[in-house]
Amino acid sequence: MELFSANYEENTRALDDLLGVGRCFDMISRDLYVGGRRARMWVVDGYGDDAVIERMLSFWLPLRDVSDAQTMQQFIDRYITFNEVNAEQNVKNTVTSVFLGKMALLVEGYDECALIDAKQYPARGVEEPSSGKVLRGAHDGFIETLVANAALLRRRIRDPQLTLEGHKVSDCSRADVVLCYLENKVDRKLLDEVRQKLAKIDVRSVSMSQESIAEAMMGKKQWWTPFPKVRYTERPDAATACVMEGDIIVLVDNSPAAMILPTHFFDFVQEANDFYFPPLIGTYLRILRIVVFLLTMFITPVWFLLVKDPSRTQAGLEFLAIDSHYSVPLLVQLLLAEFIVDLLKLASLNTPDVFSNSFSMLGALVLGDFAVQAHWLVPEVLAYMAFVAIANFAQPSYELGYAFKLLRLMLLLFVGALDWIGLVLGCIVIVALLATTKPIVGKGYLYPLCPLDKKALLALLVRKPISRDNT
């Protein structure tokens, strides 16, 4: 059955079967009389706003006659005192709408169903996200409810040019996806490309929300590149700034993270804190972040290259030499330290909040002290790895941190096998990866460096004062 008919019993049987009435404990179905006609309503328990449903029932039940409404649309116009309601004849669309939280109402004599958007999703309060915190500025953040996230953007951009364009993705989950952009600033070609990629997503479910959608949009062509092709933010102010610059924000229901498109490598240099400090300090923070990027990737491979040959640490670089005796090969020590850092991160993530901070500190101290006393690691290795672990948190992207980690491991292996030639070869591989990585949409991944856009590159490196042309 694809469309509702004028047969009331047939319509109700079809919806009861498709919605799982009697099988699913949370599917509420109630028979009632509206104006002397049989009617039935369906709603998912936990989705419906009880106050709204009760108010509508109190209006319908006293009705004596509704024969003046010849169609369901006329019935809606005259007897449903609610803003968000529409008539639907397609059975599949009705079932999907009920699972999304709407209430369905069938009335005898009509070949359409009324869908009333009286949903109220369970949601946590709006609070500052755990990542991307700022010293000053707004302390609110996106949550798992799409409507609330859209409202946070509307609150900041009170412009009729702001468009929130809705889409549905996947066959099973039918996830709600919203594209947020400014009509007068967005690149129309870029917008059409994003729409096409969303329309081509052919997956059964997007249970992991924005990550599932990002992977489906990227496809399988570039699985081998470690660099992130999407930026995420849980901060409404950061998302607002991107929209004002002409970017597209992708909001996904059930996810507090907003996707920023297009994403290029140098976009990760920016962070919300840059704009809550004066321009000079903001510029310093960006330059510091770039230096940290380079140190995070190269400090341990370069140090390993220098200490491999004692003669390289004699010309004023004696402080880099290892004084203590060690029996475990230095390359093995560095790799072991890398894995221990990741082990502590994973253990910290899976530890209850009450114990996580103390566990991380005690775990690092105990393991570090034990490794030195057992001659597994030399103190210098621990010192450099501690710097790398801390520096990873100086950049805003968790995904980029792991990309740097994989490349750092590659450099260590290349240096261990080929000495300085390995370092040069590793740098060539990194440049080749950056040059061949393609973003989901937009220009090259290294934009604005390649293709060169001096104005855009300067705007990324230097935090300019706020003006009418630079907001």
Residue ranges and their predicted role:
Residues 379-381, 385-471:
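Hydrophobic alpha-helical transmembrane segments of membrane transport and translocation systems
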Residues 1-302, 306, 310-313, 434-471:
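Membrane-embedded alpha-helical signal segments
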Residues 158, 199, 345, 372, ...:
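Short polybasic/polar patches that bind polyanions
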